Swiss-Prot record:
Organism, scientific name: Callithrix jacchus (White-tufted-ear marmoset)
Cofactor(s) needed for function: heme; NADP(+)
Name of the gene encoding the protein in the UniProt record: CAT
Name under which the protein is recorded: Catalase
Residues annotated as binding NADP(+): H194, S201, R203, N213, K237, W303, H305, K306
Enzyme Commission (EC) number: 1.11.1.6
Modification sites for Phosphothreonine: T511
Localization of this protein: Peroxisome matrix
Length: 527
């Protein structure tokens, strides 16, 4: 029944009701000139050609032709909302960041949830990591915590990131998703085992965006007012409780309501059911990092909670839907390099790579002045620098202030109090191979200690159900990796694959290589 529709379905109805007492606006061109007729083009006679003087038509079509901006290369499908972060516990002994200044302080935030590999029109219910990015609008500029719904990631070296994403996207010739590409990469990079295991567990398909946790994933550095620093990780735990979708429900929803997560978030906020997350940190001292049993900056691993317990900090609350999706969600740009004083980067290689990649892709997608777009603008800080001009400069371009530094005319000066914390580094410079930095211990703990028997069963079924479409030699490599985690893990997956392969014989012939070549020798070794 139309009378019982949800707020998202009734958006146009509500918009009209809100303007019931107002007269309709006068229709104009983009330049504000009134339009006399929006239904008929100007022609030479009723059946004649169009005239170039029809500026109503050319204004409309020229803008329409340019409506689309480049799609995000990853995290293209997303939902956004706005709200606040409130401090509930004092952590000023760890960080001088103004966002944590005192208990009760509220900071405006913007949040974007997303899937990773799919295009902007893809379903919300696919098995895929979820982006969970938070923009804090602080007095010292924006802080972007660009996280996911998992505390780990597939790789630990940013040089692999383009290849990893290519393997999850579409085949360059067929333009189809390709299990060979996905599993070939994962099987050749066993550091992905932890994230792959999480992805194919029950938490791989969250029930919308409100019922999942968020994580900064990387290791960061906190610096207090005395210049003392610690390493930290950020966690935000859902107050709605964890809920996941079964494979069957996810498949059904992908057909019936592919925008399920977007709709659920919008309707919850529109009806006053504001979602929230409790914000925590883990803290590790520099001396603890030196004696840690593995690299504390490795994003494929977690910090054990029994050794580094969660410390409560505050609450994230979302209480406003976007006024316009394109303006406030499609154009929002999250950048891990946006860190106010008191929050800094660690030597985490993946984080270091993202410090360059994210602002670089924003400049491509939105232009060099993307920080002037209202949703990205650090509106609670005064921006004063020596950057000028460029496409889509939408503000006063800092007027007549000097555009060079140093100068003698009272223009902006740097602040020594904002200097980064000094860090000692190794003098040895080379390309360090980290491919075999214990890829199985924490995965084994996840499989044996975190999952129960039913969850292990579903995990293996989910993996085998996806891996079965890859070629046999790739299946064998993947199963070998799972067996190195735990024999039971690999054995279960192999047993399920054997059933699939008996029902649907595989063709193990793959890319042709010349007999006797180095590629042929390598492929023989893989079989």
């Amino acid at each position: 029944m139309a009378d019982s529709r949800d707020p998202a379905s009734d958006q146009m109805k509500h918009w009209k009701e809100q303007r019931a007492a107002q007269k309709a606006d006068v229709l104009t061109t983009g330049a504000g000139n009134p339009v006399g007729d929006k239904l008929n083009v100007i022609t030479a006679g009723p059946r004649g050609p169009l005239l170039v003087q029809d500026v109503v038509f050319t204004d409309e079509m020229a803008h329409f032709d340019r409506e689309r901006i480049p799609e995000r290369v990853v995290h293209a499908k997303g939902a956004g909302a706005f709200g606040y972060f409130e401090v509930t516990h004092d952590i000023t002994k760890y960080s001088k960041a103004k966002v944590f200044e005192h208990i009760g302080k509220r900071t405006p935030i913007a949040v974007r949830f997303s899937t990773v590999a799919g295009e902007s029109g893809s379903a919300d219910t696919v098995r895929d990591p979820r982006g969970f990015a938070v923009k804090f609008y602080t007095e010292d500029g924006n802080w972007d915590l660009v996280g996911n719904n998992t505390p780990i990631f597939f790789i630990r070296d940013p040089l692999l990131f383009p290849s990893f994403i290519h393997s999850q996207k579409r085949n360059p010739q067929t333009h189809l998703k390709h299990p060979d590409m996905v599993w070939d990469f994962w099987s050749l990079r066993p550091e992905s085992l932890h994230q792959v295991s999480f992805l194919f567990s029950d938490r791989g398909i969250p029930d919308g965006h409100r019922h999942m946790n968020g994580y900064g994933s990387h290791t960061f550095k906190l610096v207090n007012a005395n210049g003392e620093a610690v390493y930290c990780k950020f966690h935000y735990k859902t107050d709605q409780g964890i809920k996941n979708l079964s494979v069957e429900d996810a498949a059904r929803l992908s057909q019936e309501d592919p925008d399920y997560g977007l709709r659920d978030l919008f309707n919850a906020i529109a009806t006053g059911n504001y979602p929230s997350w409790t914000f925590y940190i883990q803290v590790m001292t520099f001396s603890q990092a030196e004696t840690f049993p593995f690299n504390p900056f490795d994003v494929t691993k977690i910090w054990p909670h029994k050794d580094y317990p969660l410390i409560p900090v505050g609450k994230l609350v979302l209480n406003r839907n976007p006024v316009n999706y394109f303006a406030e969600v499609e154009q929002i740009a999250f950048d891990p390099s946006n860190m106010p004083p008191g929050i800094e980067a660690s030597p985490d290689k993946m984080l270091q790579g993202r410090l360059f990649s994210y602002p670089d892709t924003h400049r491509h997608r939105l232009g060099p002045n993307y920080l002037q777009i209202p949703v990205n603008c650090p509106y609670r800080a005064r921006v004063a620098n020596y950057q000028r001009d460029g496409p889509m400069c939408m503000q006063d371009n800092q007027g007549g202030a000097p555009n060079y530094y140093p100068n003698s005319f009272g223009a902006p000066e740097h602040q020594p109090s904002a200097l980064e914390h000094s860090t000692r580094c190794s003098a040895e410079v080379q390309r360090f191979n980290t491919a075999n930095d214990d890829n199985v211990t924490q995965v084994r703990a996840f499989y044996v200690n975190v999952l129960n028997e039913e969850q292990r069963k579903r995990l293996c079924e989910n993996i085998a159900g996806h891996l079965k479409d890859a070629q046999l030699f790739i299946q064998k490599k993947a199963v070998k990796n799972f067996r190195e985690v735990h024999n039971d893990y690999g054995t279960r997956i192999q047993a399920l694959l054997d059933k699939y392969n008996a029902e649907k014989p595989k063709n193990a012939i793959h890319t042709f290589v010349q007999s006797g070549s180095h590629l042929a020798a390598r492929e023989k070794a893989n079989l």
